[in-house]
Amino acid sequence: MTQQTVLKYGVKLLIIFMCLPVHEFSHAWSAKKLGDDSQDYKGRLTLNPLAHLDPLGAIALFFTGFGWAKPVEVDSRRFKNFKRDMALTAAAGPLSNLLLALAGTILWEVALCAYWKDAGFAVSDIAQQCGSFGSAAYYQLTAGNDALFWLQFILKYFSLINIGLAVFNLIPIPPLDGSKIIMFFLSNKLNYKLYEYQMYIYIGFIVVLFTGLLDKPLGFLQGAVSSFLLLITSWVPAIMNAIL
């Protein structure tokens, strides 16, 4: 294993330790704002990674790009509207990751534009030449520039890991966030049935996840979200072209 490979793994690990706490903190913060003041003494209103780390979920995120943290325990009895507030609390985690991914995508494009201009190319061409994370044209352009390589690597994986967290947790399978969001639209009877069998459903889901059967569909969704973020930030090259 080369030194560069070790550094890549180290960077990915640091990014995971940054992203997971934000996801769970967002759940706890949202729950508190909606009336669950028990979050004050449960120790989850913090960005300390150790308070939120789930070893299995972190390992899954590291190797597959999709994972989870230790779930925030919510006292739903304190909510004014159980189904609505549970859905909002659940949505807060994936939303925080999507916002981080958006910020990372913008910064990735800013860094790329700066180098593109410095190298003597037209910044306005960046959208056509580098329309996705890790395009061949981009790596050819930055070959040999160690500082830029590591900057783009960090920003790229910062965005992709956050997208992976959001996509995975939005799957409507208990006890993932997606199941709590969709319960808002389901009958109480059906929600009770899902709650009753959620552990069996989740164990089956984890087994399927680690067999790799979900790699392609989850990868497709991750790629779709990545492309969408690049699309809605396509204004960055124009701004950078005017500034530089």
Model-identified regions with their sequence ranges:
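Hydrophobic transmembrane alpha-helices and their immediate loop junctions
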Residues: M1-L244
